[in-house]
Amino acid sequence: MPQLITYGNELIRINPANNRIEYSTNRGISWMSRYSGSSCGTFRDLLPYNGKIIAVTDKGVYYSSNKGISWMSRNTSSQAKTFIAIQDAGRELLAQTNDGHLYYSTNEGISWMRRR
């Protein structure tokens, strides 16, 4: 599923055709590649959060502090690999899994607990 976020004065998106992180500075008229690596896995969702971009991939949760140029692992546990969507819920992050479970994090995605 393609994901598009606003980050500063840019639009940033996942291009599902080639798994690239792309950006636009002209409201989406043209797009430039920002990240085309494969070490993070397949990107599923993006979230601007506390001055960073948090990404959910098939390898876990990653973050970027430089607009998506590079990515650092945040959590690569087996449960994080099933996340398909991430949401800012104020004092916590929420992540939905591919089997319908909901997880929450109170430490910017470092650890996750299943919501009962």
Regions found by a protein language model. Name each.
Residues 4-13, 51-55, 90-95:
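Entry beta-strands of beta-propeller and related beta-repeat scaffolds
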Residues 31-32, 71-72, 112-113:
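Tryptophan-centered short beta-strand motifs
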Residues 35-38, 75-78:
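Surface loop/turn motifs at the tips and blade-to-blade linkers of beta-strand repeat domains
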Residues 18, 28-29, 68-69, 109:
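Short coil turn/linker residues within repeat-based beta-strand modules
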Residues 24-25, 64-65, 105-106:
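Conserved Ser/Thr-centered positions that define the repeating blades of beta-propeller domains
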Residues 1-8, 40-49, 80-89:
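Repeated scaffold domains used in trafficking and secretory/extracellular systems
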Residues 17-21, 59-62, 99-102:
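Loop/turn residues immediately N-terminal
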Residues 100-116:
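Blade-level signature of beta-propeller repeat domains, shared across WD40, Kelch, NHL, RCC1
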